[in-house]
Amino acid sequence: VISLQLNPSGMEAEFLKCLNLCFGDWGNRQTYHWYFQRKTAYPDADLMVLRKNDELAAGSAITYRKISLPNEAVVTVGIMTGSWTLPKFRGQGFFARIIEESIRLTAEKKGALVLGFGRTENSSFRQFAKAGAALFPTTYLFSTPETKPQAVASKLKREEKSEPVIKKLFERLSTSGVGFLRFAYSSAQEFSAQFIHRPGETEILSDSYGNLGIVEKKAGTNLLQLFLPSADDESGITSALAAFLNHSLENGRKLFLYSTRADVAQVGKNLGLGVKAGFLPALIADESSLRKGLGIDEPLTTKDSSLLALPATPWHLNPWNVHSGDRA
């Protein structure tokens, strides 16, 4: 018998232990608090644990956020995050149950969509496909021992975390996202809570060409949580990403970033970064909220989330512009 418990008390240590068991070095209590317990402008995260015959088997969280659609309408979404199944219980339908419960919880909060983040090599890819999700391609980029420094015209320097600098980052992020589906931040303060006040130490970096970014340090890796080239073409993206790559390598560190953009992925490959294919699944939760956001009059005859990936329909959700640091 599979039982599901929502927001159980006193489970933090056990849930964290399972995350680290299933994902390797997932994080500590500070990481756990940042992802699941911090107060934001959105509804509190929901945690669920699943048991089989009273034995702990799986768990997941749903965090709630807002995204801007290409027409600038804003809708609430639920994000499946930290979803784990203990090894002995894999392949027994727990992840499918987590997806179902995530849709139900998100719809309760009038959330239009359930989103997630994953690599196509993982079993979750097949599970989301089976659940009928629209699957949008993403890329994980990372330096390898073979990645070499690049010739760059300008070195990065560290910026103060001052109000004007944060405002500049927030405004650049807002303008660079126009025309894309993207995570919405209503103020510089909300932006700062997501990108600057993170579990690890963060740095704001810039160069003389106006390239900007935020790096979070984790072990020996610089996580490029926000990447804002001054020019949004191949040349501009190349010079900006090369600067962040060199900055990491010169300091004896690896570089990692995530992107939903094919042009950023191609530049990363050209610079010698390692690449892993990922996916962003989207499932309809509250259809009326999504319909209203998209400005569609006619309801769907069936709640078919795969329509979201079809260019010929008014339900099409593309292109996405999601940064590494958006994903929580």
Identify what each model region corresponds to.
Residues 14-47, 51, 107, 129-230:
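Amide-forming acyltransferase catalytic core, primarily the GNAT-like/NAT-type
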Residues 79-81, 85, 97-105, 110, ...:
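Hydrophobic, well-ordered secondary-structure scaffolds
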Residues 85, 91-106, 234-247:
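Conserved acetyl-CoA-binding loop-helix of GNAT-fold acetyltransferases
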Residues 47-49, 55-65, 79, 84, ...:
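Conserved beta-strand in the GNAT
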Residues 64, 113-155, 213-235, 242-328:
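Active-site/acyl-donor-binding loops of N-acyltransferases
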Residues 74-87, 220-232:
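Conserved acetyl-CoA binding element of GNAT-fold acetyltransferases
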Residues 69-71:
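Flexible helix-coil transition and linker loops at the boundaries of alpha-helical arrays
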Residues 1-2:
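Extreme N-terminal starter segment of soluble prokaryotic enzymes
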